[in-house]
Amino acid sequence: VQRVEEPSGLPVRSQSWELTGLRRALGPARDHARQFLEAGSDDLAEDLLQDALVVVAELVSNAIRHAPGPCVLTLSQDGGRLLVSVRDGSASSPAPRPPDLSAGGGGFGWHLVQRLSERVEVYTHGESGKTVTATLVLVGGVKRCEV
């Protein structure tokens, strides 16, 4: 685990994992996230842990589905906030689409990420890709993004 100091002087825990661009990367991504969160907090509520794991799975799944090649998952915990970042090789911004309730075609992920997160940001890196970062509140009353 890498530790860096923020200007506030508070330590930030951060760790990154390179994942294949294959669906089998979803399980390891969730496992990494669970281990990271459990190592950083003895009293993280189960519902908040599950919310974080859903956000990790959805962001990694979107990267695998819509971007070529591997992606990088980075988790950073700063006090009561968790930043879930996924960098992929597509410069296209995520585009919400209507959920497909009949054919099982998805469409729920981006809506879930926005609903479970306090904030979601997309940073583009020219033609080399983008990073999607979701910020989750891990303590107290959870303020969620407006959908």
Predicted features and spans:
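Short, well-structured hydrophobic secondary-structure segments
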Residues: V55, V60, I64-R65
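Conserved short strand/loop->alpha-helix "switch" segment adjacent to the catalytic nucleotide/phosphoryl-transfer site
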Residues: D31-A57
